[in-house]
Structure formats: structure tokens, C-alpha cells
């Protein structure tokens, strides 16, 4: 049996879980319902998941609440769940604000996504891959320019 890389596996399970939830329960549920169902799906899949994680920024020595992450998955993925017809720029900005705040605390955020459960029984996922670009394989040169011979 082939296993996907550990970085890709949680996101694959998240998307699969959203599909199962929307097929089984359809639209018209609350954000809290979808959040809890996804949390249960991930639990049964063996993936660590925390709900409603407070996110802070520091103002000197004083912590200031930035907001609450809907789901933090596998200590590397941040999810913001919405019940609406489309993902708006403000939803993405909210997600990225949480990502920056968590990265400032030392969390290695590799993925972040806004997941939108729509009225038309579909799920829209806007995923941000936050992993740093991989260096080229050993012995591979990206580009190198040499002066012409004299």
C-alpha cells in the first residue's frame, strides 16, 4: 500500500471529509455543525485536530487576541470554515492573518485553507500551500552563466 507524504495526507483527508459531510448532510447546516463533523471525521482518520484555537499577537509583553482558528490540523494546517456561496477576499485575509500570527509563535504552518460549504450542496476549497520551495536536487544547477571564452 502506498501512503501519501505526511504533508499532503491531512489536506487530502480534509477534502475527502468535506465531500462526505456535504453528501451525507447536504446544505443548510451551521458552520459549527460542519466544523464538528469534520473534526470527528479527522479523529476517526487518526489525524490530530484542535478546534477554536485562540491566536494571539504580542504588543510588547501583552498578548492581544487576533481571533480563533476554526480547526488546526496535525499541527501544520489551519482551516477557516464558512457557510456562504463563495469565498470572498476578506475570508482569505482572515486566514492569512491567522497564519502570520501562528508563524510568529513558531508554528510550522505548511497549509492553510478556507473551506466554504455552499447552499448548492458543494464545497469550495481555497488552499494556500505555505511550504518553502524545495531546493534543487543535489548536483542540479538552476542556471549559471559563464563569460564567453577569450
Residue ranges and their predicted role:
Residues 19, 54, 84:
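Histidine- and/or cysteine-centered catalytic micro-motif in compact active-site loops
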Residues 1-27:
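Interdomain/boundary linker segments immediately adjacent to catalytic/signaling cores
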Residues 82-136:
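Nucleic-acid nuclease catalytic cores
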Residues 1-10, 137-150:
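Non-catalytic C-terminal interaction segments of nucleic acid-processing enzymes
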Amino acid at each position: 500500500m502506498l501512503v501519501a507524504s505526511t504533508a499532503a495526507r491531512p489536506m487530502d483527508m480534509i477534502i475527502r471529509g468535506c465531500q462526505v459531510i456535504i453528501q451525507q448532510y447536504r446544505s443548510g447546516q451551521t458552520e459549527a455543525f460542519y466544523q464538528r463533523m469534520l473534526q470527528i471525521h479527522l479523529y476517526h482518520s487518526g489525524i490530530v485536530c484542535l478546534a477554536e484555537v485562540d491566536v494571539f499577537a504580542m504588543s510588547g509583553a501583552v498578548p492581544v487576541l487576533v481571533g480563533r482558528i476554526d480547526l488546526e490540523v496535525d499541527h501544520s494546517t489551519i482551516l477557516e470554515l464558512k457557510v456562504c456561496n463563495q469565498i470572498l477576499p476578506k475570508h482569505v485575509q482572515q486566514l492569512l492573518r491567522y497564519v502570520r500570527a501562528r508563524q510568529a509563535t513558531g508554528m510550522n504552518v505548511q497549509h492553510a485553507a478556507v473551506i466554504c460549504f455552499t447552499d448548492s450542496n458543494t464545497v469550495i476549497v481555497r488552499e494556500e500551500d505555505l511550504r518553502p520551495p524545495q531546493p534543487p536536487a543535489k548536483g542540479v544547477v538552476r542556471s549559471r552563466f559563464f563569460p564567453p571564452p577569450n
